[in-house]
Amino acid sequence: MEYMFLLMSKFFFVFPIIIYIGPAEIIKPQAAEENSRRRILNPNENKEEIVKRRRRIGSKPPSCEKKCYGCEPCEAIQFPTISSIPHLSPHYANYQPEGWRCHCPPP
């Protein structure tokens, strides 16, 4: 009896997932194929740029393409975020989180 309960519970857990995922692959098989073949690295980057990008510590800068409303070059800059919550313990007293913004450099 216990075995039958486990079998039925697995069936009712897995079956809806198969039903949910299945039609997406049937309707758009070419989209799934494109996603699996998509290159992670930009083919125009040279090896030095790839190594430099991989060695960067922390978060990645955002893509600032079409975010500066016409100025060139639009570049990502890092800035410290200002927290309204006071530090609750001395362990985080020196911690300053940083964020990214897209910015036009001065001419």
Curated annotation (Swiss-Prot):
Keywords: Developmental protein, Disulfide bond, Secreted, Signal
Keyword GTP-binding: no
Domain of life, source organism: Eukaryota
Paired cysteines (S-S): 64-102, 68-74, 71-104
Compartments in which it is found: Secreted
GO cellular component terms given for this protein: extracellular region
GO biological process terms held by the UniProt record: guard cell differentiation; stomatal complex development
Main subcellular location: secreted
Signal peptide: 1-24
Biological function: Controls stomatal patterning.
PANTHER family registered for this protein in UniProt: EPIDERMAL PATTERNING FACTOR-LIKE PROTEIN 3, EPIDERMAL PATTERNING FACTOR-LIKE PROTEIN 4
Record family assignment: Belongs to the plant cysteine rich small secretory peptide family. Epidermal patterning factor subfamily.
This protein's name: EPIDERMAL PATTERNING FACTOR-like protein 3
Native organism: Arabidopsis thaliana (Mouse-ear cress)
